[in-house]
Design a protein with these regions (language model features):
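Active-site-adjacent structural elements that line small-molecule/cofactor binding pockets in enzymes
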Residues: 1-173
Length: 173
């Protein structure tokens, strides 16, 4: 990821401060009316956007580092899990809960989106929900596969329908 910043001429070491300011700017602009921001990274004169979003824009923050989890707890409306070892998920969720408590944000609504092999069965989704997961991220193609996607759309739709019938339709509402 550092090379992405190098290509753009952006300092990798300011990425945390940069996203903090970007979130403040997004929330300020989405609130309606004129907004200005004078931070260490960005300096915006009094500006506004139109039309203003009809509802608050949910901000989901990803990452497994303590800095990312603290940022999600402090500034986010939710957290995006980046995948990995399923056995590590409870510890990540516990760290996130601790950061939310420390930030005083544990009483507000908060989404937890998780990539997990448990997302593909009814019992697995229930196990995730029992851990505080609100949403699962599912895919039917390995996300890190490089090269062209040659699977026909009809096959993708078949997989999606099968998932809807075997998992989504069987969730308690």
């Amino acid at each position: 990821m550092g090379e992405d910043y190098d290509v753009l001429g952006v300092d990798w070491d300011t990425r945390g401060q940069r996203i903090d300011e970007e979130i403040a700017i997004l929330r300020g602009l989405a609130a309606g009316g004129y907004f200005e921001h004078h931070g260490k990274i960005f300096d915006l004169p009094s500006v506004k956007i139109a039309p203003v979003p009809s509802a608050p824009i949910p901000i989901l923050i990803g990452g497994h580092s303590d800095a990312a989890l603290r940022r999600a707890a402090r500034l986010g409306d939710g957290w995006l899990h980046g995948g990995g070892d399923l056995a590590e998920l409870p510890a990540l969720l516990a760290r996130l809960a601790g950061h939310r408590h420390a930030a005083g944000t544990d009483g507000r609504p908060f989404e937890v989106h998780v990539i997990s092999s448990d997302a593909y069965t009814v019992d697995g989704v229930r196990r995730l929900a029992d851990q505080g997961v609100t949403d699962v991220i599912v895919g039917f193609r390995w996300p890190y596969h490089t090269g062209p996607d040659t699977e026909p759309l009809a096959d993708k739709l078949t997989k999606l329908r099968r998932y809807a019938e075997t998992v989504i339709s069987r969730q308690a509402t």
